[in-house]
Amino acid sequence: MPTVTWDHIHLRSPDPEATAAWLQDILGGEIIRGPGRIDVKLGGANVFIAPVNASDGVNSPPVTPYQGLDHFGLTVKDIDAVAAEIKAKGVEFTKEPTTIRPGVRICFIRGPQGISIELLERDRKYA
């Protein structure tokens, strides 16, 4: 079996600057400018954000449920405090913080261009 590690997620956005700013302001990412795109270091991986224009012939995001990438998840410490902090910044929650099983609490937020982002907190004693 090959050994793999996460390197990046590549997003396309009609406003890469705004998308990068959101990832920085809401999730604490570090903006790094790359050739032809903006990169954001986030949680040990990179988010590449390339521009897309309406004239590029790109389809709108599909209505859920659909096949393909559904969301990406990020671990946090003290999910309730994080949720309160980002809610105060106006972030839309599609699922409020909840316990899904002992030791695991999650919530879902709506990111730029409707991206679904899961925040989760794991209590290692249940791992």
Regions found by a protein language model. Give the residues of each.
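Short glycine-/small-residue motifs
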Residues: L119
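Vicinal oxygen chelate
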Residues: M1-T5, E30-G73, A84-R110, D123-A127
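Histidine-centered catalytic micro-motifs
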Residues: I9
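Conserved active-site tyrosine of GNAT-family acetyltransferases
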Residues: T19-Q24, I86, G114
